[in-house]
Amino acid sequence: MRTALFLLLLLALAAIPGSLVPQVTSDPNGVVQYKAANPGLSTVLDALGVFNTYSSIWFSAIYLLLFISLIGCVIPRTKHHFDALRARPPKTPARLARLEGFTTRETSVDAEQAVATARELLKKQGYRAELYDDSVSAERGYLRETGNLVFHTALIGVLVTVGIGGGFGYTGQRVVVEGYAFNNSLSSYDSFNPGRFFSDSALEPFSIAVDSFVPVYEEQNKNALGQAIDYTANVTTTLRGQKPQSATIKVNEPLHIGGTEVYLLGNGYAPVVTVRNPDGDVVFSQPTAFLPQDANLSSLGVIKIPDGLAEQIGMRGFFYPTASTLDSGALASVFPDLINPTLTLEVYTGDLGLDNGQGTNAYQLDVDSLTEIAGRTAAQPTIKLGIGDSIELPDGLGTIELTAVPRFVSLDVHHDPALAWIFAFAVLVVAGLLTSLFIPRRRIWVKAIRGTDGSVTLEYAGLARGDDPTLEAAVADFADKHSDRLGLKVEP
């Protein structure tokens, strides 16, 4: 049992990195940002599997050892418990005076009748009682050990069902811009983490369209100005063969659809940039999610345009919902809502590496092999746009316009087929724990000693297995009730 407790503590400690470092399964964008901000440390953490803490080898090893240890505890204890349930209560000790709550009563009632009455009364109080000559031995509280076994068995059940759910379930993340939708298919996810036994058939067809995203920010309290109060994503869901339905997703209030839970993880802005070639033809016009960098949603983003212009163009920029110029001359956002939206872009030309067959990060731009044509080190200054502003690109490449700034939401889709079983076992864990903590395991003996003058002395005593602060009172209370049943007068 000590080994199981040690492993349980070790498992809790091993789970700490999962709450300190962003996880690929729940916050892939956060992982990207963390790696960009800590390139040296992230290499070590990645090698150790910290970004996938709960599926790492070391975490799984602790998990499996705990599972084996619990089974090793439960099986022998269960056998011992069943043997104890079938066994008779132990014989009455020779000297009850050494036991807790010892008390005596004098009676003229026949010893056999007194003991038989005690046995009957003990059975009514839920004791298993057995007669031994002129004494009765009784015990109760086996439900305490039953609760203990239920607790440990249910804990094993939780571990098993979590493993099954992880094996057959999946999690996926998708960034969805206002006015757009996504379908529950593999190709629609930005990142997807299937279980070991996942099958495509587990993806129930449905779609979620984000109609609007409504944030509420603090505007009255100057000390908390701009602090988020509430987020609401208004969506339209469609299941195969059913009519579209309106729904909302809030933080900690997921949407239940198609056997999945859809959580609202994050949000931000997705500026719509429209680029035209020198002839005025639109070569690029779509929203691009910019990743928030602070509480006021100053956001960083990358736009890549591989086709339609004389050269491939990559742009790296910042978006400020409420732009304000600092004393240093730099821009910063002072409020997370759209009050003075401003987009700044550094423009690069060259091979973006999109045609070499290797995957690239949509949120990063490798500028080592590119030429900056607008920005801090270029002849042309950084491009600065407000909504509706249009500016010519350097070198006569065309024009660029900030058309609109919709919001985007980051959705996490979670499917766990064992969720109901996990909940059921969790309830059993709590029930078993409470039972094992609050139901006392105790024994009570009543012994009749015959005197030479024909009188009978009744001795009462008890014994607890573990702490039982109410045992003495229970023995005294039973002695009083037994005396009352026999018609004895008890002096106060």
Segments predicted by a language model, with ranges:
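Solvent-exposed, non-transmembrane regions of integral membrane proteins
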Residues: M1-P492
